[in-house]
Structure formats: structure tokens, C-alpha cells
A protein has these predicted regions:
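Canonical Radical SAM [4Fe-4S] cluster-binding loop centered on the CxxxCxxC motif
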Residues: 14-49
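A C-terminal junction/extension of Radical SAM enzymes
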Residues: 215-235
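Conserved AdoMet/S-adenosylmethionine-binding subsite of the radical SAM
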Residues: 55-67, 76-202, 212, 219
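A secondary-structure boundary/capping signal
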Residues: 23, 71-73
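Class I S-adenosyl-L-methionine
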Residues: 19, 211-212, 231
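Short, charged low-complexity linear segments at domain edges
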Residues: 1-17
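Conserved beta-strand termini and adjacent loop/short-helix elements that scaffold enzyme active sites
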Residues: 6, 189-191, 232-235
Length: 235
């Protein structure tokens, strides 16, 4: 495992649980608002943390935390992810996996081996804007397949989208509804623009007040009609 960081304690990242967060190195997307560029750009990768030391740390935290969040970067790019998750599960922790949905095969393996308890998947944009926003070659079929795998898993899950003016907002944001289905839990979250992958983007990024926007109200009305639980984080 290439582990680029460790946050010892969080009350926010796993709903209802006290967790530690493990950040993996490497990502196949290059979203301009990404606030962890040191996990995305190989030229600025830090020396990876020793995996055995991370596991020993978690073992010592068994009475202080109840869960571990594995995020990135993009965790499903790690070839030994499943073995790592199973070692965490063996310590009786709940495991939350964050993913961009680009690797449905690895997601299926994680579920097959019962290595996760909660899945959070980022929805970056409506289908026609995916490659533009992520600045990467994206197979929309993989995104759709990952969403369906997650829905059928029987596990708690969420889909979420980062909102930033000039990048994804208004009617573009509303078109993400085409990816959602009845019963989905969907979060909109403001971008963290203190640090971003794209230095130029940082100077023009703004997190809009969604609740005051007409397009958000339209999205909210649609969600209620289609039984999608739509919530806003950070407001």
C-alpha cells in the first residue's frame, strides 16, 4: 500500500462512528478543486508511510475508535487494497471506502470479501462533462456500473458532489439527477479552496450558498418527487 497520510481521529468522516482516516497516494482523476494535490501529483508525493506501522497504530487504537476510513487519492488503484482492508476488518473496525467509481472490478472484490461496511462515491459531473471536469479519460460505463454495484451491495452508501462556481454549478449540477435513482442518499458539498490541485483555480473558486439558489431549489424539488435524499454539507 502507498499510504500518503494518516489522520488519527475524526468525528465527521464516517457517519455515527469515531474513525481514523488513511489517505492513499495516486489518483486517475485531476479535478482542479482537489484539496489533496500531494496525493495526486507524483512529483510532490511524500515518502509513503510504512504500512506495518500504520496497522500497528490502528491496533493500539482499538478502544478509542470504532472505524477506519480509507480515502485518497483513489484507493481502488492500490493493488493490495483488499488485503489491507481485510487486515483492518480483522481488528474489528468498521471500514468506510471512498472512491471515484472508476474501478468497479476492485469495488466488486471488496464487497465479495466483505472488506467494507460503508461506501462513499464521488459523482463528479453529469455524463457529458465528466472528462472535462476530471481532465482524465473516463469510462462512463464504469461509473454507472460502480453506482449499481454499490446500490445492490446492501451496505449503507452515499453519493456526493463537490460544488464550485465556474466549475460545476447551476443547470450543470442539476443534470446530475440523471445518474440518481430512488432511494439514493446524495450529498452536495462545498469545495475546500484553501489548497487546490490547480493553483489558477484557487483564485476563482467560490463555494456558493446553495440554499439561496434557484437551481438548487429545483434539484431539491426533483429529489423529493423521486425519493432521493438530498442534503447539503457545510451549510
Amino acid at each position: 500500500m502507498r499510504i500518503g497520510g494518516l489522520q488519527k481521529f475524526s468525528l465527521l468522516d464516517y457517519p455515527g462512528e469515531l474513525s481514523s482516516i488513511i489517505f492513499t497516494q495516486g489518483c486517475n482523476f485531476k479535478c482542479p478543486y482537489c484539496h489533496n494535490p500531494e496525493l495526486v501529483v507524483p512529483e510532490i508525493f511524500r515518502q509513503p508511510l510504512d504500512t506495518e506501522k500504520v496497522l500497528r497504530f490502528l491496533y493500539r487504537r482499538r478502544r478509542k475508535i470504532t472505524a477506519v476510513v480509507v480515502t485518497g487519492g483513489e484507493p481502488t488503484l492500490q493493488e493490495d487494497l483488499i488485503d489491507f482492508l481485510r487486515l483492518i476488518k480483522a481488528m474489528r473496525f468498521k471500514v468506510k471506502l471512498d472512491t471515484n467509481g472508476s474501478n468497479p472490478e476492485m469495488l466488486s472484490r471488496a464487497l465479495y470479501y466483505q472488506a467494507v461496511d460503508y461506501i462513499a462515491m464521488d459523482l463528479k459531473a453529469p455524463n457529458e462533462l465528466y472528462q472535462k471536469l476530471t481532465r482524465s479519460k473516463v469510462k462512463i460505463a464504469d461509473i454507472m456500473r460502480s453506482m449499481e454495484i454499490i446500490r445492490l451491495s446492501g451496505l449503507p452508501y452515499e453519493f456526493r458532489t463537490t460544488v464550485a462556481e465556474d466549475i460545476l454549478f447551476g443547470d450543470d449540477l442539476f443534470r446530475i439527477r440523471d445518474l440518481l435513482k430512488e432511494g439514493d442518499r446524495y450529498y452536495l458539498q462545498p469545495c475546500n479552496y484553501s489548497t487546490t490541485l490547480d493553483d489558477l483555480a484557487r483564485h476563482r473558486l467560490k463555494s456558493p450558498n446553495l440554499s439561496s439558489e434557484e437551481s438548487f431549489q429545483k434539484f431539491k424539488d426533483w429529489a423529493e418527487q423521486h425519493r432521493v435524499l438530498l442534503q447539503v454539507r457545510g451549510e
